UniProtKB/Swiss-Prot annotation:
One of its GO terms (biological process) is DNA topological change. This is DNA repair protein RAD4. Residues 730-741 have a biased composition (Acidic residues). Pfam families: BHD_1, BHD_3, Rad4. Belongs to the XPC family. Its main location: cytoplasm. Involved in nucleotide excision repair of DNA damaged with UV light, bulky adducts, or cross-linking agents. InterPro entries: BHD_2, DNA_repair_Rad4, DNA_repair_Rad4-like, Papain-like_cys_pep_sf, Rad4/PNGase_transGLS-fold, Rad4_beta-hairpin_dom1, Rad4_beta-hairpin_dom3, Rad4_BHD3_sf. One of its GO terms (molecular function) is damaged DNA binding.
């Protein structure tokens, strides 16, 4: 090595070599320090016991619920002290000796068991377990609809009962002449409010008279018509006790005598007003179970008292004021109040305890002419933002269904009173205003947040926001609110064509969006798609058919009919599966009609040909040909079914012939009779419930006792209910063949006659 190098270089090289050797050397463990009083173990004794005994397994339990992080307890037989690390340990000269490979045999097996924390996810598990499944949600929704129909029909029946003429004659005697005059005041031309005031005084007098006449002698059975929880409904389904139904005669007797529960009392009060020729209608607040409650455990608290439940009524009354053109609300039993509802009604339930059993969602009105109307808008202050979300009418399917139910129960023509009431409901919708929370603005029928405007929507030109919403908890954050009438829907040119409209000449797109093209993964690409508004389109008018009936077709040889306006003016659409076959049979001009598209797996799209487009003067001929083709198809199906039945009969007769021949030639094989006790009991049970007519290949006798089939004891093969005389018993194989040939001849003759 060069001696000219300074000493510092040699020291650096020596230090680097020492560090490499230290890295290659095996790591040594620190010596375990034992207690002073504990004697050293005998090496020989330990070696002997190690050969005779298997190593014991040590268990290490790690509990994640423990608050001491990083501390693990290892229970072993040897007591070992844990030495805290300090600077003195590094200065100590005592090191642990490296164990040889032969000493590894004494090492014990250690199994580590980790227990997950149960407290950490306990709350999350409770919430996840208390949410019902999708199937349960559907079941609750349809049960809610069924329950609602039953309640509405119940109110309709009670409204029919209180129109009894016999009951009206009895109740009219309760009202004196002075009160009757107050119920029918003359119109005050100077101040119509005076006439309304007299009507209100007459209603107040009627309430006082009815309170003297009626005595509430009975409480509600369980919860009555108030809302039940899902758990209570399941328990009542398992309960098989019979409920006593109230008959019409019992109802009329209770109203005449003035004894019963509060619901019958209100219904009797409406009957008394109708007996006085007052336009009064029965109001019912239907309380079906809440289908928006997604919890599995829907049990209520035990603190719910009977007084909280009956604080707000289920039934009340409305009287028409012909002077102010409004309905007056009357509650003669519970709250004993008379009001003209403006924004908030006194009959709307308030408080958590009252709303658990009485939730204002469906308020149905029944008038004296058997009319049925939904008047929930009058009593619900926040109808569109809060109440609507708990109704079945929150989506289009439920809205259509509810209208059908109302229409089925509405048995009168429309009057001017309905027009006044609809105008009042429209004013209430306008005066409800913008909700004060983001949650209430979700799916609102009249307002939408700026952040909820869809990609295919824009704000109409010249329209601005109608209000602002300040977000709670976020300083300075304000959201814009737009009216839905100021939002325009945009569609592409193809989408407008599917609706029977095409773009105007020179129209410009209102918006350009990115559309994903290509269904398979990895092949999706984005391309620009131009969107147009309704004002940029016009109605598509197809060309007319020629005098010979020829129709203009596209390149595929058909015509697209996605809307009724896409049919040529002198043509018609005939939708039938065999319409194309009928037109080809007649040899007339036609065009297959593509009315929709069918999407299959992947990106495959196939057109649906549901009929044809022909000239109007050929419609009758096409329909006649379709009827003939359908008749031929039905006749072919009938013949095919008949041939199948005849083949089955033929197979049965062949089997009987072969069996009879084998028995007559080789004799009958003895078989054990089956155990008929169990089958006889089953047949008796079926015979007790209903009787069956004979069917199948072998005709039976009506009301005949069912018996299991058993082999006859005679050498000949016969059936129990078929009488066989002695002449037939001596029949030979030739006789059987002649009978079969005669049967086949008759069969061929019947086919020729057909």
């Amino acid at each position: 090595m060069n001696e000219d190098l300074p000493k510092e270089y040699f020291e650096l090289i020596r230090k680097a070599l020492n560090e490499k050797e230290a890295e290659k050397a095996p790591l040594s463990r620190r010596r375990r320090v034992r207690r002073k009083n504990q004697p050293l173990p005998d090496a020989k004794k330990k070696f002997k016991t190690g050969l005779n005994e298997l190593p014991r397994e040590s268990v290490v339990t790690v509990n994640l619920d423990s608050s001491d992080d990083g501390v693990v307890t290892v229970p072993t037989d040897d007591s070992v002290e844990e030495i805290q690390s300090s600077e003195e340990d590094y200065d100590s000269e005592e090191f642990e000796d490296v164990t040889d490979g032969n000493e590894v045999a004494g090492v014990e097996d250690i199994s580590v068991e980790i227990k997950p924390s149960s407290k950490r996810n306990s709350d999350a598990r409770r919430t996840s377990r208390n949410v019902c499944s999708n199937e349960e949600r559907k079941r609750r929704k349809y049960f809610h609809m069924l329950y609602l129909v039953c309640l509405m029909v119940h109110g309709f029946i009670r409204n029919e009962w209180i129109n009894s003429k016999r009951l009206s004659r009895k109740l009219s005697n309760l009202v004196p002449e002075k009160v009757f005059e107050l119920l029918h005041p003359q119109k005050d031309e100077e101040l119509p409010l005076r006439s309304t005031r007299k009507l209100l005084d007459g209603l107040k007098k009627c309430m006082e008279l009815w309170q003297k006449h009626w005595k509430i002698t009975k409480k509600y059975d369980n919860v009555g018509l108030y809302m039940r929880t899902w758990k209570e409904i399941e328990m009542s389904a398992n309960n098989k006790r019979k409920f006593k139904t109230l008959k019409r005669s019992d109802f009329l007797r209770a109203v005449s005598k003035g004894h019963g529960d509060p619901d019958i009392s209100v219904q009797g009060f409406v009957a008394m007003l109708r007996a006085c020729n007052v336009n009064a209608r029965l109001i019912m607040s239907c309380q079906p179970p809440d289908f928006t409650n997604m919890k599995i455990d829907t049990s209520l608290n035990g603190n719910n008292a009977y007084k909280d439940m009956v604080k707000y009524p289920i039934f009340w009354c409305e009287v028409w004021d012909k002077f102010s053109k409004k309905w007056i609300t009357v509650d003669p039993v519970n709250l004993k109040t008379i009001e003209q509802v403006r924004l908030h009604s006194k009959l709307a339930p308030k408080g958590v305890a009252c709303c658990e059993r009485n939730m204002l969602r469906y308020v149905i009105a029944y008038d004296r002419k058997y009319g049925c109307r939904d008047v929930t808008r009058r009593y619900a202050q926040w109808m569109n933002s809060k109440v609507r979300k708990r109704r079945i009418t929150k989506d289009d399917f439920g809205e259509k269904w509810f209208r059908k139910v109302i229409t089925a129960l509405h048995h009168r023509k429309r009057t001017k009173i309905d027009d006044y009431e609809d105008q009042y409901f429209f004013q209430r919708d306008e005066s409800e205003g913008i909700p004060d929370s983001v949650q209430d603005l979700k799916n609102h029928p009249y307002y939408v947040l700026e952040q909820d405007i869809k990609q295919t929507q824009i704000v109409k030109p010249g329209c601005k926001e109608c209000g602002y919403l300040k977000v709670h908890g976020k300083v300075g954050k304000v959201l814009k609110v737009y009216a839905k009438r100021d939002i325009a829907d945009l569609k592409s040119a193809r989408q407008w064509y599917m609706n029977g409209r095409i773009l105007k000449t020179g129209s410009r797109c209102k918006k350009v969006i990115k559309r994903t093209v290509g269904r398979p993964k990895g092949e999706a690409e984005e391309e620009d798609e131009r969107l147009y508004s309704f004002e940029d389109t016009e109605l598509y008018i197809p060309p007319l058919a020629s005098a010979s009936g020829e129709i203009t077709k596209n390149t595929f040889g058909n015509i697209e009919v996605f809307a009724p306006t896409m049919i040529p003016g002198n043509c018609c659409l005939v939708e039938n599966p065999v319409a194309i076959k009928a037109a080809r049979f007649l040899g007339v001009e036609f065009a297959p009609a593509v009315t929709s598209f069918k999407f299959e797996r992947g990106s495959t799209v196939k057109p649906v040909l549901s009929g044809i487009v022909v000239a109007k003067w050929l419609r009758e001929a096409i329909e006649t040909a379709i009827d003939g083709i359908e008749f031929i198809q039905e006749d072919d199906n009938r013949k095919e079914h008949l041939l199948g039945a005849l083949e089955s009969w033929n197979t049965l007769l062949l089997k009987l012939r072969i069996r009879s021949k084998l028995n007559s030639t080789y004799g009958k094989i003895a078989e054990e009779e089956p155990n008929v006790t169990k089958e006889q009991n089953i047949a008796d049970n079926h015979d007790n419930t209903e009787t069956f007519m004979g069917g199948g290949f072998l005709p039976g006798i009506a009301n005949h006792e069912a018996r299991p089939y058993s082999e006859p004891s005679e050498p000949e093969d016969s059936l129990d209910y078929v009488s066989v005389d002695k002449a037939e018993e001596s029949a030979t194989d030739d006789d059987v063949g002649e009978d079969y040939s005669d049967f086949m001849k008759e069969l061929e003759m019947s086919e020729e006659s057909d």
